[in-house]
């Protein structure tokens, strides 16, 4: 299979367990190909865990899930050293993050210290325990979920932490027809029976192919102009950082690959910008008072920044 056929096969296989959420699956796979992590804002019970299991099966990845609660410790994520009487030395006991695909369920129920431990692993790709450094397996993907802020026992993730996630999306309720189909059979069981379409090494090759997608200089300038517009907007108190621009570039390349192209276009930028950038924007007090949202302000900016004409 060529690259486009492989990507389509992954989506088709994953879609057997996740009904009616093709757009969500495409966004998640795009972020995975871009080498990023995923943050999902939604209520419990809309299929987030099923999505995670489905992707780990189709991508051939090891998988661990942790239900975050206030009593979860950083060492539960990173691991710890244990004294081994037989050898007379300390040995490392791996934490939950030592895997390919880590589902951090309800991350905003954990303490800030525990959240920071996970975000450090996400950023560095390695973790430190008692002065020793351990590298997480590659590929390494974190899918974190959080309940809407204000739900019992939750605390909002600060901007410095949400900025570490390449995309922030919602799943939403299923349609009436799809919910009926869900009632007819267990989607979770269907996810467990999915076949592996590719191997972890294949995924690394797909990531390399995404990174090699050609981007014209004028398109890089377009991305920077979008970021600059967020920094200059009176509706925004904190605009897109260079990290956000880099995420936009990676997502643009990955989206082009998803579409079967070896080159990126302005349409790729516009397709991924809403869910790659909106969580990196902090609105001004006046904008919030006026009822504006990060999504609506970003949409206005995307419409105002001139698109380049590629040669």
Question: Where are the regions that the model predicts?
Answer:
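Canonical AAA+ ATPase core
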Residues: 84-89, 110, 114, 122-213, ...
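C-terminal engagement/docking regions of AAA+ P-loop ATPases
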Residues: 232-311
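Walker B catalytic acidic pair
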Residues: 42, 105-106, 117
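P-loop (Walker A) phosphate-binding loop of NTP-binding proteins
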Residues: 43, 77, 145
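Conserved alpha-helical scaffold flanking the Walker A/P-loop in AAA+ ATPase domains
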Residues: 27-30, 83-103
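Walker A/P-loop
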Residues: 32-69
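AAA+/P-loop NTPase substrate/partner-engagement loops
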Residues: 58-86
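Dynamic helix-loop-helix/coil hinge segments at AAA+ ATPase domain boundaries and subdomain interfaces
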Residues: 1-24, 212-214
């Amino acid at each position: 299979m060529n690259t486009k056929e492989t990507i389509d096969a992954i989506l088709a296989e994953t879609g057997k367990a996740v009904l009616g959420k093709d757009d969500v699956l495409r966004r998640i796979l795009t972020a995975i190909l871009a080498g990023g992590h995923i943050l999902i804002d939604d209520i419990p019970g809309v299929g987030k865990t099923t999505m995670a299991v489905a992707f780990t099966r189709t991508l051939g990845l090891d998988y661990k899930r942790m239900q975050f609660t206030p009593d979860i410790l950083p060492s539960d994520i990173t691991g710890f050293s244990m004294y081994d009487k037989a050898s007379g030395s300390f040995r490392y006991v791996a934490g939950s993050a030592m895997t390919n695909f880590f589902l951090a369920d309800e991350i905003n129920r954990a303490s800030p210290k525990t959240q920071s431990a996970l975000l450090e692993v996400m950023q560095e790709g390695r973790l430190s325990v008692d002065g020793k450094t351990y590298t997480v397996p590659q590929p390494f993907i974190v899918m974190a979920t959080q309940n809407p802020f204000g739900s019992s026992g939750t605390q909002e993730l600060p901007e410095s932490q949400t900025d570490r996630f390449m995309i922030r999306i919602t799943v939403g309720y299923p349609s009436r027809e799809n919910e009926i189909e869900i009632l007819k059979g267990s989607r979770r069981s269907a996810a467990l029976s999915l076949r592996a379409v590719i191997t972890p090494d294949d995924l690394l090759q797909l990531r390399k192919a995404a990174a090699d997608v050609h981007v014209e200089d004028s398109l890089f300038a377009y991305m920077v102009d979008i970021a600059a517009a967020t920094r200059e907007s009176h509706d925004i108190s904190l605009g897109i950082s260079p990290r956000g621009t880099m995420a936009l570039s990676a997502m643009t390349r990955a989206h082009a690959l998803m579409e079967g192209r070896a080159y990126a276009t302005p349409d790729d930028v516009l397709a991924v910008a809403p869910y790659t950038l909106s969580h990196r924007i902090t609105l001004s007090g006046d904008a919030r008072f006026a009822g504006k949202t990060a999504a609506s302000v970003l949409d206005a900016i995307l419409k105002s920044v001139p698109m380049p004409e590629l040669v």
